[in-house]
UniProtKB/Swiss-Prot annotation:
<keyword id="KW-0067">ATP-binding</keyword>
<feature type="binding site">
    <location>
        <begin position="73"/>
        <end position="74"/>
    </location>
    <ligand>
        <name>substrate</name>
    </ligand>
</feature>
<dbReference type="GO" id="GO:0006526">
    <property type="term" value="P:L-arginine biosynthetic process"/>
</dbReference>
<comment type="pathway">
    <text>Amino-acid biosynthesis; L-arginine biosynthesis; N(2)-acetyl-L-ornithine from L-glutamate: step 2/4.</text>
</comment>
<keyword id="KW-0418">Kinase</keyword>
<keyword id="KW-0808">Transferase</keyword>
<dbReference type="InterPro" id="IPR041727">
    <property type="entry name" value="NAGK-C"/>
</dbReference>
<dbReference type="InterPro" id="IPR036393">
    <property type="entry name" value="AceGlu_kinase-like_sf"/>
</dbReference>
<dbReference type="GO" id="GO:0005737">
    <property type="term" value="C:cytoplasm"/>
</dbReference>
<dbReference type="InterPro" id="IPR001048">
    <property type="entry name" value="Asp/Glu/Uridylate_kinase"/>
</dbReference>
<keyword id="KW-0055">Arginine biosynthesis</keyword>
<dbReference type="GO" id="GO:0005524">
    <property type="term" value="F:ATP binding"/>
</dbReference>
<feature type="site" description="Transition state stabilizer">
    <location>
        <position position="255"/>
    </location>
</feature>
<feature type="binding site">
    <location>
        <position position="95"/>
    </location>
    <ligand>
        <name>substrate</name>
    </ligand>
</feature>
<keyword id="KW-0547">Nucleotide-binding</keyword>
<keyword id="KW-0963">Cytoplasm</keyword>
<feature type="site" description="Transition state stabilizer">
    <location>
        <position position="38"/>
    </location>
</feature>
Length: 308
């Protein structure tokens, strides 16, 4: 089954024609543009969602859009730690990474999660190539701390991306490939750090001049007053988001920080979407209403832009 057939499976031929016709303005708008997609959450553990996501990436490449995938691997890392009798701990939304945990993170991200995703995409053609933040000096990291109950807290070998050397990724894009990036990176002394995938995706999107950053999550989008489900925001600008960040649930903070960084760094829009919905990336890019929450540089008017 081709990527296009996979993406349009389950609907009639008439509906397929309507969907493709409706998508035309967005196909034109995003042709030859780079879209960075952070792959994570339930989308990377459910087999049907994994297959749908891979088809979406191949679809984008087929219609002339240039996807770059940046992936985490939280569920798989947790599973491997459990098999090895090791415990996992989170503080401030980030994994506490000891040297022993770092060995597992490195093995799982590049050797398991990345390889599986490359294989799923390449079922549609020889498109995807795996790369890690260590390769060709793609990322350089510095150790970070997080605020827990108002205090800076050490979380081990966890880093922030401080420099990006995007040439290896740009070379792959120019060759018609889909880069699949594992988020591990050395510091200036060569010590490898675990990089939050949301953080890495934002830094890469900024460095390569992406048109969009799309972050997959396990919720419908950003709730400004969780758990009030009526507080789901379809759009928020960077100033409003910056004010809201301190009050967000710890798990959402890295995702929204990533969107904030990307848009402030020149990416036109960033999006948090529900990765539990099959083909959610296509719904965001190619439908008028989009899906999830869009982060913008400033308030937008209803007539601004063609797509969300």
């Amino acid at each position: 089954m081709t990527a296009i057939s996979e993406a349009l499976s389950g609907i009639t031929d008439h509906q397929k024609a309507h969907v493709l016709a409706e998508a035309l303005p967005w196909l034109q708008q995003f042709r030859d543009k780079v879209v960075v997609v952070k792959y994570g959450g339930n989308a990377m553990v459910d087999d049907a969602l994994k297959t749908a996501f891979a088809a979406d990436m191949a679809f984008l490449r087929t219609v002339g859009i240039q996807p770059v995938v940046v992936h985490g691997g939280g569920p798989q890392i947790n599973a491997m730690l459990g098999k090895l009798g090791m415990t996992g701990e989170f503080k401030g939304g980030f994994r506490v990474t000891t040297p022993e945990v770092m060995d597992v993170v490195r093995m799982v991200l590049f050797g398991q999660v990345g390889r599986e995703l490359v294989g799923l995409i390449n079922a549609h053609g020889p498109y995807a190539v795996g790369i890690s933040g260590e390769d060709a000096h793609l990322f350089t990291a510095t150790k970070r701390t997080v605020m827990v109950e108002g205090k800076p807290t050490d979380i081990g070998l966890v880093g922030d991306v401080t420099t990006v050397n995007p040439e290896a990724v740009l070379d792959l894009i120019r060759a018609g490939r889909i880069p699949v990036v594992s988020t591990i990176a050395p510091d200036s002394d060569g010590v490898v750090h675990n990089i939050n995938a949301d953080t890495a995706a934002a830094a890469l999107a900024e460095a390569i001049g992406a048109e969009k950053l799309v972050v997959l999550t396990d919720v419908e989008g950003l709730y400004t007053n969780w758990p009030d489900r009526d507080s789901l925001a379809t759009e928020i600008d960077v100033d409003a988001l910056a004010q809201l960040l301190p009050s967000l649930d710890a798990g959402m903070v890295p995702k929204m920080e990533a969107c904030l960084r990307a848009v402030r760094g020149g990416v036109p829009t960033a999006h948090v979407i529900d990765g539990r919905v099959a083909h959610s990336v296509l719904l965001e890019l190619f439908t008028g209403e989009g899906i999830g929450t869009m982060v913008t540089p400033g308030p937008t008017s209803p007539t601004e832009g063609v797509a969300s």
